[in-house]
Design a protein with these regions (language model features):
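Glycine-rich phosphate-binding loops that contact phosphosugars or nucleotide phosphates
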Residues: 1-124
Length: 125
C-alpha cells in the first residue's frame, strides 16, 4: 500500500499505516524527494486530494516513476476527476463535500478505518 497526495489528508492516514504495518501489511507514504522510488504493478496506491491540486502538481513526475503500472484509487472531493483520462486511476472515490479540508480529512479517516477493519476481519478472524 502506498499513500500519496496532499499533505493534510496524508497526515490523517498515520494510524492506518501503523495498524496495517502491525498486521504485517507494508504501508508507506510516497515522498517526491525520493529520487529512486519506482511504483510496481503489485502496488495499491491511494491518492488523496480534496481539490485536485496535489494531483495536478505531481501527475507528471508520478507517471515518470511508473505510477500507472500500479492499481490507483483516487480519493477526491472534486467531481471533475471522476472521468478524467490523464490520471490513470483505476478507481475514483468521490468524497462528498465542497473542498472543505476538515470535512475531507474526517471522511478520509472514516474510509481508511473501514479498509483497516475489513482487512483485519478478512485475514485475522
Amino acid at each position: 500500500i502506498i499513500l500519496a497526495g496532499g499533505y493534510s489528508p496524508l497526515s490523517v492516514t498515520v494510524d492506518f499505516q501503523t495498524d496495517m504495518i502491525s498486521m504485517g501489511k507494508q504501508a508507506v507514504e510516497y515522498h517526491q524527494f525520493d529520487k529512486n522510488f519506482k511504483f510496481k504493478d503489485t502496488d495499491v496506491v491511494f491518492f488523496l486530494t480534496a481539490t485536485g491540486r496535489a494531483l495536478s502538481h505531481a501527475s507528471k513526475s508520478l507517471k515518470e516513476k511508473g505510477l500507472c503500472e500500479s492499481h490507483i484509487v483516487l480519493m477526491t472531493q472534486n467531481i471533475k476527476y471522476k472521468n478524467y483520462d490523464s490520471i490513470c486511476a483505476d478507481d475514483v472515490v468521490h468524497v462528498l463535500g465542497t473542498f472543505d479540508g476538515i470535512e475531507f480529512n474526517y471522511q478520509i479517516m472514516r474510509l481508511f478505518d473501514l479498509i483497516r477493519i475489513r482487512y483485519y476481519t478478512k485475514y485475522f478472524i
